[in-house]
């Protein structure tokens, strides 16, 4: 006599796994990264977060404490807003830019799946409008105009396009 286990849990897989996060975040600000998956909490074993292949956060069900935090250059993990479903990065700086992913592992059956990686770019927008200065106050028709456009520091650097009478 043979027995076959055809229970639903033995056939379970991770049908849905998606990393939801912003593409850009402002330097000094924060970013919330969500690991949206279809694993019921009772079957969830572990969720890991990686930046550029390096582990930065881990949740393991049943471990005390369930969360572990790993060094992350250019950001702090906000412990109050991080869980098995999301992490929040705060005090962002340029080294936090990079590729992020989450890995979800089930208890029964033992199965893991990694999300697609997504890029986060920490930016610093201009804090003032560009300023145009001219070498002279007035110009005669046909005279060569010399001007300078100065922008405030920004990352990525601003792209400057000159228009004269709304034409390039």
Q: Model-derived features: where do they sit?
A:
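Flexible inter-domain hinge/linker segments at boundaries of tandem extracellular adhesion modules
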Residues: 2-19, 50-55, 68-69, 106, ...
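Short beta-strand segments of immunoglobulin-like
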Residues: 19-26, 38, 133-139, 151-152
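Structural beta-strand segments of beta-rich domains
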Residues: 29-33, 143-147
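Ligand-binding face of N-terminal immunoglobulin V-set domains in extracellular IgSF glycoproteins
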Residues: 30, 34-36, 74-119
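Conserved beta-strand elements of beta-rich interaction domains across eukaryotes
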Residues: 37-38, 54, 94, 107, ...
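N-terminal V-set
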Residues: 40-73, 155-168
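Short, surface-exposed binding/anchoring microloops in extracellular/periplasmic proteins
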Residues: 139, 144-146, 153-155
